[in-house]
């Protein structure tokens, strides 16, 4: 019997899933609920190639089809539809089993709201000396669950001991699965579901699951999982803010001077709890201290003062807010902020940025064209250009300009 299925949401990987099911002999309709194929040349080309290959076995809809004619409906967990459906995480898990057998025993999967990318990067860094690992997180592209299929299809899977994935819509079938946090519970699927239920319902896909004790307390959770590990992030005691050093139970961990930001403590606890099943604690301590992040943030010392520089043509308001928060938590001091207009196509919203800056109690020194515009909304000093040798205190420099 040939199943007739509907897969919804091109933006989150419907075409990738469609290709897998078509190759398995299914007939597939795709509902492009957000009209992405009309807006994206990449999606359009991908659909056209699939259509040429599979012909009438694949059809595309931009309006809601009749759900009753389908044997299965597959969609992201947050999809706003009034019909029972299989979440993408479960569909991907089933295909993995069908194509690759027990590959889930090699998979480490991290989801949540914040900290996913850092946690997966840390896990990879801790394990990669002892094991052959493959990392895919948001630094490398889409983290929608169907992307995992695309990644594994491109690899010789026998070469790797572990695959480490960051996902956005819950956990796929995996050996180790972590939900770093759910910072707020809000309605999804057009108000039909909530984010909390969606995230934690995917815990069933993890053989060993890891969740944040703060979430249990915040939402009064009662989770039934035979191998549930509760990460008590509040057991971590910060010993030094920079270089970041902390005590967790009876172990002391330290990061290098290239890392700053107190959020690294919470992220590292999930990496520690997962990796202690695979390497000894001494190895984890050593690897943590050698961890670095490839980004445009530079930290250095000038005349016994700490200078944190973030010079980036694409800096947005959210990234600026996080950078200031991290800096003030660790160092305090002056904030140099500004730069130039016309660096990238998408200009920064100066008024919106000023509203974010008003939340922080600190001294601003505005720089360049953007800085001059900010003076219309905020009090602060002003300089036309910035000279790092003239800083008077620990300083954070956030400039939206070309990287030299």
UniProtKB/Swiss-Prot annotation:
Q: What class of enzyme is it?
A: ligase
Would the keyword Lipid biosynthesis turn up in this protein's UniProt record?
A: no
Task: Report which superkingdom the organism of origin falls in.
Answer: Archaea
Q: Which UniProt keywords apply?
A: ATP-binding, Ligase, Methanogenesis, Nucleotide-binding
Positions bound to ATP = 112-117
What Enzyme Commission number does this protein have? 6.4.1.9
Any single Pfam family the record assigns to this protein: Mur_ligase_M
Instruction: Name the job this protein performs.
Output: Involved in the biosynthesis of the unique nickel-containing tetrapyrrole coenzyme F430, the prosthetic group of methyl-coenzyme M reductase (MCR), which plays a key role in methanogenesis and anaerobic methane oxidation. Catalyzes the activation the g-propionate side chain of 15,17(3)-seco-F430-17(3)-acid (seco-F430) for intramolecular C-C bond formation to yield the carbocyclic F ring of coenzyme F430.
* Family, per entry: Belongs to the MurCDEF family.
What is the protein's name according to its record? Coenzyme F(430) synthetase
Natural source organism: Methanocaldococcus jannaschii (strain ATCC 43067 / DSM 2661 / JAL-1 / JCM 10045 / NBRC 100440) (Methanococcus jannaschii)
